[in-house]
C-alpha cells in the first residue's frame, strides 16, 4: 500500500520536533511528540481576577465586577495533565496574567466616584463645570451690552398724544356700552397711534401719486380724434368773429355803448349767489331780494335810451366759446384727496359726501 502525504511529511521531521520543509520548500508547522488535542481545561489551579474579591466580600459583603477581565483558557494541552501545562507556561504569559489581575483590582477604586461614572464627557477631557461657568459669563455680558445699546437709542415720539387717544377710545367705547379706562394701557395706546399714523400716511401717499398723474402732460393722442368736432369748432369760431364785428359796428354808430364799469355776472357767479340766497332763506333770514320776487315792469323808454346796452347784447352775456388755458392746481387739492378716499370702504362715506359738497372748480 502506498503511503499518504501526511505520513511522508511526518517521516521527514526530526525527533526534536523541529520545523521541516517539504519537497517544494514550504513550512508545514511544528510536530510535537505525544501531543493530543483535548478539551478546554477550566481548573481551579489557574489564577483568576475573582480571587481578589474574597477578602473584600468578608469585610463589606459587596463585590464589584471588574471593568474588563477574561478567563484564562487552555484549548490545547499536552497529555501529561493540567500540572504539566501550568509548569510549561512561559514567564511572559505569567507577567501578562499579573498585569490583568492588577488592572482588575484597581478598576473598582477608579469607578467608585459616581460623578465621574455618570459623565461620559469626562473621559474625553471636557470639564462640564468650567463650560457652564463660561456660558453663564457670556450670557451676562450679552445682557449688559444690550441694555447699554437700548439706553443709547432715542425713543420715537408717538404720532398722537396718548391722553387724547385714551379719551377718544373711552368715548367710542361708552357709545357701545363698554366702560373702560384706556389711560393705563400704554401698549394699546401706542398700537392705536401707530395704526392711525399708517392710515393717514397711506392716504397722503395715494393723494401725492394722484396729484402727480393729474399734472403730468399726456404726450400721446394729443390731436383731435373726431372730424365732426373739428368742423363744429371752426363754425363756432367764425360765428364768434361775426358777432364781435357786429357789436363793434353798433358801438361805432352810437347804437350801443361799450361796457366799462358794469360787469356781467357769469353763470358760475349767479349759481353761487343763488345757493347763498337759498341757504339764508332756509336759515330763517328775513332779508329778501327783489330779483327773487316779481319785480316791477321794465318801461319801454328804458330800452329806447341809447345810453344803455341793448337787451339783446345784455342777454347774450358771455355765451359762446370761452378761451382759456388748461389750468391745473399745484400740489394736492380736494379732488385728489377724494379720489384717494374712494378706494376706502369703511368709515369714508360721510367724508366723501361732505367733500363733494364743498369742492369747487
Curated annotation (Swiss-Prot):
<dbReference type="GO" id="GO:0061629">
    <property type="term" value="F:RNA polymerase II-specific DNA-binding transcription factor binding"/>
</dbReference>
<dbReference type="Pfam" id="PF05236">
    <property type="entry name" value="TAF4"/>
</dbReference>
<keyword id="KW-0804">Transcription</keyword>
<comment type="subunit">
    <text>The 1.2 MDa TFIID complex is composed of TATA binding protein (TBP) and the 14 TBP-associated factors.</text>
</comment>
<keyword id="KW-0539">Nucleus</keyword>
<comment type="similarity">
    <text>Belongs to the TAF4 family.</text>
</comment>
<dbReference type="InterPro" id="IPR045144">
    <property type="entry name" value="TAF4"/>
</dbReference>
<feature type="domain" description="Histone-fold">
    <location>
        <begin position="166"/>
        <end position="234"/>
    </location>
</feature>
<dbReference type="GO" id="GO:0003682">
    <property type="term" value="F:chromatin binding"/>
</dbReference>
<dbReference type="GO" id="GO:0005669">
    <property type="term" value="C:transcription factor TFIID complex"/>
</dbReference>
<dbReference type="GO" id="GO:0006367">
    <property type="term" value="P:transcription initiation at RNA polymerase II promoter"/>
</dbReference>
<feature type="compositionally biased region" description="Low complexity">
    <location>
        <begin position="96"/>
        <end position="107"/>
    </location>
</feature>
<protein>
    <recommendedName>
        <fullName>Transcription initiation factor TFIID subunit 4</fullName>
    </recommendedName>
</protein>
<dbReference type="GO" id="GO:0045944">
    <property type="term" value="P:positive regulation of transcription by RNA polymerase II"/>
</dbReference>
<dbReference type="GO" id="GO:0003677">
    <property type="term" value="F:DNA binding"/>
</dbReference>
<comment type="function">
    <text>Functions as a component of the DNA-binding general transcription factor complex TFIID. Binding of TFIID to a promoter (with or without TATA element) is the initial step in pre-initiation complex (PIC) formation. TFIID plays a key role in the regulation of gene expression by RNA polymerase II through different activities such as transcription activator interaction, core promoter recognition and selectivity, TFIIA and TFIIB interaction, chromatin modification (histone acetylation by TAF1), facilitation of DNA opening and initiation of transcription.</text>
</comment>
<feature type="region of interest" description="Disordered">
    <location>
        <begin position="1"/>
        <end position="117"/>
    </location>
</feature>
<keyword id="KW-0805">Transcription regulation</keyword>
<dbReference type="InterPro" id="IPR007900">
    <property type="entry name" value="TAF4_C"/>
</dbReference>
